[in-house]
Structures are given as C-alpha cells and as structure tokens.
Design a protein with these regions (language model features):
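Solvent-exposed edge beta-strands and adjacent loop segments
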Residues: 1-27, 62, 184-191
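Oligomerization/assembly interface segments of phage tail-like spikes and tubes
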Residues: 23-39, 70-82, 203, 264-274, ...
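Short coil-to-beta transition motif at edge beta-strands of beta-rich domains
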Residues: 37-49, 278-289
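Surface-exposed cap/loop segments at beta↔alpha junctions
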Residues: 38-119
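Short beta-strand and beta-hairpin "edge-sheet" elements
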Residues: 47-75, 160, 287-312, 317
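Short beta-strand-centered interaction patches in the first periplasmic/extracellular domains
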Residues: 66-71, 78-81, 121-207
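Solvent-exposed, acidic/flexible segments
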Residues: 69, 96-104, 137-145, 196, ...
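Acidic, small/polar-enriched beta strand-loop surface segments
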Residues: 95, 176-311
Length: 320
C-alpha cells in the first residue's frame, strides 16, 4: 500500500497517510499535484513518497462542503514545478547563459542561481556515477526545469529527482532505451502514427516587411532536416515559425531545431501493468509495437502521471 508522508510548514515530518487520493504529473507540462485527504495540512508543507520522485509543496486548499461533510483537496507544485517556476537569465551584459563541466557541479550552480539551493542537493548519479555536460547554451529566459531537461537531453542524459532526509536530490544519468526487449504483454499503449508531418518550416526573424530575415528549412520522408527540399505538391506541409529579433545565424539554428522537434513519429500513451516491474523516467525512449497492425512508434517519455486511489498506485506515461 502506498504511504504518503506529510510535513508541517517547516518541513518536519508529521504523519504517514494511507487513506488519500493523489493525482500528480510532471514532465512536458502540468508539474503539479492534487491531493484529497481528510486532514488539515499547512500551506507550504511538503508531501512525498520517501526515496521517490513524486512529491511537492502544498500551495492551495479547496474546501467542498456537502451534506455537512467537508472534502479537502490540496493543490501544489511537484519538485519539478518548483524548478519550472524559476527563470534562467543570462548574466548581465551577456546574450546567453552557457555552462559546461561535471553534471552535479553544473546543476548545483544552476539551482543556486535560481535560489533553490535550500531545497535541492545536486549529486552524482547513484547508479551511473559522475556525468559530464559539454558546453551547452540555454535559450534566453527559459524556465529552469525545461532548461535542465534540454541540457541533459543534449548530452544523452535525463534529469532525476528523489526526496530523502529532508532534501530533494537532483542528478543526471544516461537515458535508458527500451526497445524490442519489452514484452508487449507488460504494457498497453495508444499510439498515433503520423506519416506526414510539417516538412517545410519558414523561419521569420528580425526586421519588417520586405526587410525581414527569412529562412527555409525542409524535412525529407525519413525526417532528416536540411535546407534542401525533397517533398513537394500534396506531400509538402508548410508552417511558419515566428522568432522575432533573431539574426540569420540564430534564426537558422532555431528553425532547424523546431522542424526537428516536429518530426516526431507520433504520439504514445503508455500504461505499464502493475506487476511488470518496468519503470520509465522522463527522457527515456520506448518502442511501441502492435503485431496486428504492424504499427511501430519510437517515442521519448515526456510526461509521468502518478495516481493513488484506495491505496493502489498506478503510473501512466505520455510520450512523443
């Protein structure tokens, strides 16, 4: 049975709960939770599963009174949401924030930069040891969580978090690739296979009207991106990417990256059977295949949804 630990506003453990309903999500969006429990919890308290990634800070309370009975529903940010509410700004006089070095050192400096070093401890991976971040340039004024995930992804890594002993440990470790080694009986999935995606992206940058910087990027039938067009007529799908104030070099880089992002093979919702023993992390890759239709979709886990009801914990995943 799942047990949820609740602290007070000073983050001192107060109770271990078994009777509660929880809906938490983190990854590409949401990064928050909703907790229904018959107990008063102070604003600013932590709720968490010991040693796990699921947890966060209580920010709100909804009190629903019906037939003389109150239902208390608390809302809050997951640890990931706390990071997502902080912005990584360039140093004064600099156009971009650039980092490199040992992952724990880099992550620790970024955590301190956004004022969350009182909550998070940057550590080496407990299973894979120290990792390295090659020179990485953040998008201007990106949120800290998105920036950290993208930095890790650019280095073949994923971002991990776990609450233990009053602190949230945060680290980077290599991405796991789950392919044909997974027994299809252990997972269910809803997969949408997209054969034709946007393959011509027009980037619009600095300037006005005829003086505006314009670049063109193309994807071929296999999703390879370049400035050479191969798909035309009914097969050409064109979109505009507005990246105002960008000069040509930056506009080319961002338009290329955007078109690469649009080349996802499809969308996948993955449900792992409770007794499978399989645990994905945001950033891992998975291959979903239905032998009947022959549909195979390679996707990256972009979201993790944890729910608890009647003492039973379930985990779903979003992938793209």
């Amino acid at each position: 049975m799942a047990e949820l630990i609740v602290t007070d506003a000073s983050h001192v453990d107060q109770a271990s709960l078994e009777d509660f309903t929880l809906d938490a999500a983190w990854g590409a969006d949401e990064n928050d939770f909703e907790l229904t429990v018959d107990r008063l919890i102070d604003a600013g308290s932590y709720v968490y599963f010991d040693g796990g990634e699921c947890g966060g800070v209580v920010d709100s309370l909804k009190d629903s009174l019906k037939d003389g009975r109150s239902t208390l529903t608390y809302g809050g940010r997951t640890w990931h949401g706390m990071l997502a509410n902080k912005i990584l700004e360039p140093d004064k006089g600099k156009d971009y924030l650039t980092v490199s070095g040992t992952a724990s050192t880099v992550i620790g400096s970024l955590i301190s930069r956004v004022g969350l070093d009182g909550v998070f401890d940057a550590v080496d991976s407990p299973t894979a040891g120290a990792q390295t971040i090659k020179s990485y340039r953040f998008d201007r004024y990106t949120d800290c969580y998105t920036g950290l995930r993208r930095m890790c992804a650019a280095n073949g890594l994923k971002l991990r978090l776990a609450y233990a002993s009053g602190r949230v440990n945060i680290w980077a470790e290599p991405v796991a690739h789950y392919g044909d080694s997974i027994d299809n009986d252990l997972i269910d999935f809803d997969a949408t296979r997209t054969w034709r995606k946007p393959n011509h992206l027009i980037g619009l940058g600095k300037g006005d009207l005829a003086a505006r910087v314009v670049v063109h990027w193309y994807a071929d039938a296999k999703g390879n991106v370049s400035q050479t067009q191969s798909l035309r007529g009914v097969d050409e799908i064109t979109q505009v990417y507005d990246y105002s104030n960008a000069e040509t070099a930056e506009l080319n880089q961002k338009t290329c990256e955007k078109l690469q992002d649009l080349q996802s093979e499809g969308e996948v919702k993955v449900t792992v059977h409770e007794d499978s023993g399989i645990v994905f992390d945001v950033g891992d890759t998975v291959t979903a295949r239905d032998n009947l239709t022959g549909i195979t979709v390679n996707a990256t886990i972009s979201k993790k949804i944890v729910k608890v009801s009647d003492g039973v914990l379930s985990v779903d995943y979003g992938a793209e």
